[in-house]
Each structure stands twice: as structure tokens, then as C-alpha cells.
Amino acid sequence: MSSPSAPLATPDVELDVHTLSSENLPWLCIVWDDPVNLMSYVTYVFQTVLGFSKKRATELMMQVHTEGKAVVSSGEKDKVEGDVKKLHTAGLWATMQQAG
């Protein structure tokens, strides 16, 4: 086994702190798989509550079903809170978190 000769140089990188600030990151609405709701109902909710086309609603429902969760909306905190509340009212398991 050879020993390292010299540390690798790292280039000088200036980070724009404002760009990386968590305040600038969008919020995500995540729907989680649950043992209660039928796939057809989840698709229906995505169409009627979030306004997705049947094709997109089906794709998101399948992502929830196969991967356990899907991001169904993103944006400002107030908007995403509203989406989570609507999904809860429809009986789906939804949470929100900040991207990043």
C-alpha cells in the first residue's frame, strides 16, 4: 500500500451565501404511501385537489406506490402548507420539508 505523497490542492471557491441560504430554498409537499387509500383514489385526489392531468396524477401515484413517497408540489411555504392541508382533508398522508 502506498502512502499519500502530498495533499491534493483545492481551488479557491467563493460561495454566494445568499444563494445557499436556506431561506431561499423552496418547500416540498411529499405524499407518503399508506395502507388505506386505493391507488385510484390517490390518482383522483391528485387530479381534483392539485389539478394534475390524469396521466401525471397516475405517474405520481405510481411513484408513491413503488417508492413510498413522491414530491407533488413545491414553492413558497404558505402555498405548500395549503397543499398539505388539502391533502390531509382528502385523507392522504402528506408532509412538508424544505428542499436541500
UniProtKB/Swiss-Prot annotation:
Top-level taxon of origin: Bacteria
UniProt record, GO biological process: protein catabolic process; proteolysis
InterPro entries: ClpS (IPR022935), ClpS_core (IPR003769), Ribosomal_bL12_C/ClpS-like (IPR014719)
Known role: Involved in the modulation of the specificity of the ClpAP-mediated ATP-dependent protein degradation.
Family per similarity comment: Belongs to the ClpS family.
Description of how the protein assembles with itself and partners: Binds to the N-terminal domain of the chaperone ClpA.
HAMAP family recorded: ClpS
The protein's name: ATP-dependent Clp protease adapter protein ClpS
Gene: clpS
